[in-house]
């Protein structure tokens, strides 16, 4: 008899994010979206760090769905901007998810800053289970900001 997989709710309805979680964890877990778990919420990300925001989302979904949950938060930190846009990366221009405007504002704010304009992409993931301590991981990818967008087919700060 095949062992039943533990249900893991992803604190997102983003199809690309769900696909990635299913590709990585689908053999070990039954990965479901918030929508599939019957959770209809716009969770306020009011933490001051990526880790706090991931934990806020994961805890909300765990409590609403009475199941293990996983959430992530990520963004760009630019040294010359004191770490901005940071946790506000997706809404840096004032509107959530306007990638072109976020990139334009970032480049505007870096005008006159000489190379190398050091930056890093930060991603935090929180895994929570009822009656267990949370597991929180953080990863970074170092780089620098160029003078203009380059490439195609990307998203966010990778156009």
Regions found by a protein language model. Give the residues of each.
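Anionic-ligand binding patches
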Residues: 2-9, 15-159
């Amino acid at each position: 008899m095949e062992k039943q997989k533990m249900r893991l709710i992803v604190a997102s309805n983003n199809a690309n994010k769900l696909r990635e979680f299913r590709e990585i964890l689908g053999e070990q877990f039954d990965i479901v979206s918030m929508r599939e778990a019957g959770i209809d919420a716009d969770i306020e990300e009011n933490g001051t760090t990526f880790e706090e925001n991931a934990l806020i989302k994961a805890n909300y979904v765990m409590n609403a769905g009475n199941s293990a949950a996983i959430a992530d938060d990520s963004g760009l930190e630019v040294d010359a901007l004191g770490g901005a846009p940071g946790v506000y990366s997706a809404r840096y221009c004032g509107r959530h998810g306007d990638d072109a405007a976020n990139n334009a504002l970032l480049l505007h704010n870096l005008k006159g800053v000489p190379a190398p304009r050091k930056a890093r992409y930060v991603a935090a993931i929180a895994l929570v289970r009822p009656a267990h301590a949370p597991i929180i991981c953080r990863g970074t990818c170092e780089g620098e900001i160029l003078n203009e967008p380059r490439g195609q087919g990307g998203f966010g700060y990778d156009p």
